[in-house]
């Protein structure tokens, strides 16, 4: 227990420090995947869909292992927590797994195409997801989480937070679906064009990822509503899963911050640069891109 607690605390503090340090770097360097993927076909470029599935599955797997092992629990003695939805930590564990069921399996399998990814991206994502999944699973099965969530179902604010999680989760899926429909439409048109080229010339051009201006829902206000929706999702989750950390000093923050808030902050610091640069990319690529749209926070940024 003592060794597990020490490892948990050290990992938690480093996980709090690294994302804000890397945030300015990501404003300068483009992460080599998606619209910023290199155009070459070197051995370091991986299939976009397969690499995505592998790197994202790491998170729920490491989460389940840590949650079932309960390394920070004084009551479970190494046995799993109660695996019932009447147990608040288990309900929150289920919400975490539902998110990754969609993110790691359903969404990529429904994606008609995805740009290749440089091997550095899935390697970094695997490191992130092992850390995040393990910390989250260890926390939700801990004695501290048990105490904080005792009687949670009787508190209206708990269900407000769960509602925020659900709103963000659905928003994420809705806006991702708009992007998927753009790809599906492009793939259908591309296949028809390729068939025509085959008939006329006996060969077709190499396949390239298609991009267009997305419309609908929050796309009328921001370029990255899927990012914004994910922040709403994990803000609601953190609100119900853990106490708010102290912001009086860096030392007090590192002492009191818990994995649900670490995940939220890490997503924010990681996605802000990507959204800003992607927003600029849209404007550069499409002269008619809506000028009133912000990057990722409606009306603000």
Regions found by a protein language model. Give the residues of each.
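Hydrophobic alpha-helical transmembrane segments of polytopic
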Residues: 15, 19, 52-59, 92-99, ...
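Intramembrane catalytic core of multi-pass membrane enzymes that act on lipidic substrates
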Residues: 69-142, 169
